[in-house]
Amino acid sequence: MHKYNAYRKAASTIAKYPEKITSGKEAKKLDGVGEKIAKKIDEILATGKLEKLEKIRADDTNVAINLMTRVTGIGPAAARKLVDDGITTIEELRKHQDKLNHHQKIGLKHFEDFEKRIPRPEMEKLETFIKAQVEDLDPDYIATICGSYRRGAASSGDIDILLTHPEYTSADEKQPELLLSVVKQLEKSSLVTDTISLGESKFMGVCQLPAEEEDEEDHLFRRIDIRLIPKDQYFCGTLYFTGSDMFNKDMRAKAIEAGFTLNEYTIRPMGSTGIAGEPLPVNSEKDVFDVIGMAYKKPSERNM
């Protein structure tokens, strides 16, 4: 507080001085201007800026940019533009929603809820509810919640679902109606509340677990993604989207050592020319482990 008052007093004195200040030495003659402030005046006169102030401003800018990127849908470039436009807080952002696209508006609308992790008991309820709805629609569907939840995590950031149907394989034309039907079913059941985007094979949106009689308050709004994958690629997909990232990298490296190439779609043998062959049939995650000669690990054993 003492330093703040010292700067305030010096600024007031300089502002009232009738002549243009040309040096720190000249400024020191004024009441309240000491050696440190005089040096800063010399720096401003010589360079047009003050390094310490520039660092503070840069730090403030970075803090504001990091805050903006916490809003779902706002990336670093969009965040910097907002901050350059003078928007540095969530409150200010709410007053300037004309600068946001559809995705970003939904991210802002549910900002506080999306900041909170989803406890495992809630994830388990969501899984039970979603699977029941999908089975009611068509029992041939297969739906798996992947990510850290499948690895046994105590909490999750969002709900990431892989969906498939035996009538859909990679040899077929895309079948967006398979995804659309599930999304409509989840909307009808009041689980899905907002659509961020809906394409041929991926839905991004918002969901809220419907309240039950014993619930004291409504559940929070959560981010949900659903990916539709051909049945013949499903188990490579669940393996990949279950993770962890480090486990996936380790498994891909072991596949290469064994003469195969593995990604989120297929596992294929590598020929002597370095060109990958036809995808191998995969009917379970264990099939992939077996092909590359790796001991099977349950999802809960894949945290690295």
Q: Which sequence ranges carry the predicted segments?
A:
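Extended, alpha-helix-rich binding/interface surfaces that flank or overlap catalytic cores
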Residues: 1
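Accessory alpha-helical DNA-binding modules that contact the DNA backbone or grooves
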Residues: 4-159, 163-203, 235, 249, ...
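Short, conserved, surface-exposed binding loops centered on an aromatic residue
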Residues: 152-153, 216-218
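Intrinsically disordered, low-complexity domain-flanking/linker segments in eukaryotic proteins
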Residues: 170-175, 210-217
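Non-catalytic peripheral regions of nucleotide-handling enzymes
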Residues: 206-207, 211-215, 226-304
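Phosphate/ribose-recognition catalytic cores of enzymes acting on nucleotide-derived substrates
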Residues: 221
